[in-house]
């Protein structure tokens, strides 16, 4: 059984991170921006797992840290969606351009 080289994992992680970064910087829908940020976090998790599995000293530290990162990402998504729902109820829009003013 052949093993997948580390460069394939790292290339995939770079591609995922770049797609997420491009989406987070160019899209105007807040839900899409949150999804793109989650995609970037998943690319980082892929790097953590790849380096912990295929590094010079393989151990499970990167995999455990990746699990903690997924838990934090789930909490971040829940809080982000709750804030988005509250903003939508007040402004009736989910576009980033229209959420830049503060009420005083």
Swiss-Prot record:
Quote the NCBIfam families the UniProt record gives: PRK05715.1-2, PRK05715.1-3, PRK05715.1-4, PRK05715.1-5
Q: Which PANTHER family match?
A: NADH-UBIQUINONE OXIDOREDUCTASE CHAIN 4L, NADH-UBIQUINONE OXIDOREDUCTASE SUBUNIT ND4L
- Function per UniProt: NDH-1 shuttles electrons from NADH, via FMN and iron-sulfur (Fe-S) centers, to quinones in the respiratory chain. The immediate electron acceptor for the enzyme in this species is believed to be a menaquinone. Couples the redox reaction to proton translocation (for every two electrons transferred, four hydrogen ions are translocated across the cytoplasmic membrane), and thus conserves the redox energy in a proton gradient.
Give a GO cellular-component term. Answer: NADH dehydrogenase complex
Keywords, ordered alphabetically: Cell membrane, Membrane, NAD, Quinone, Translocase, Transmembrane, Transmembrane helix, Transport
Transmembrane residue ranges: 4-24, 31-51, 67-87
Record field: catalytic activity: a quinone + NADH + 5 H(+)(in) = a quinol + NAD(+) + 4 H(+)(out)
Report the domain of life of the source organism. Bacteria
Regarding protein family, the annotation reads:
Belongs to the complex I subunit 4L family.
By which gene is this protein encoded?
nuoK
GO biological-process terms attached to the record: ATP synthesis coupled electron transport
What is the protein name given in its UniProt record?
NADH-quinone oxidoreductase subunit K
């Amino acid at each position: 059984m052949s093993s997948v080289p580390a460069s394939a994992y790292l290339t995939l992680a770079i591609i995922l991170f770049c797609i997420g970064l491009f989406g987070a910087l160019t899209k105007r829908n807040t839900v899409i921006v949150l999804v793109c940020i989650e995609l970037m976090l998943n690319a980082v998790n892929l790097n953590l797992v790849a380096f912990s599995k295929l590094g010079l000293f393989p151990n499970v530290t990167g995999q455990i840290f990746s699990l903690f990162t997924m838990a934090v990402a789930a909490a971040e998504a829940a809080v982000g969606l709750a804030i988005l729902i509250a903003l939508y109820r007040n402004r009736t829009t989910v576009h980033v351009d229209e959420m830049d003013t503060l009420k005083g």
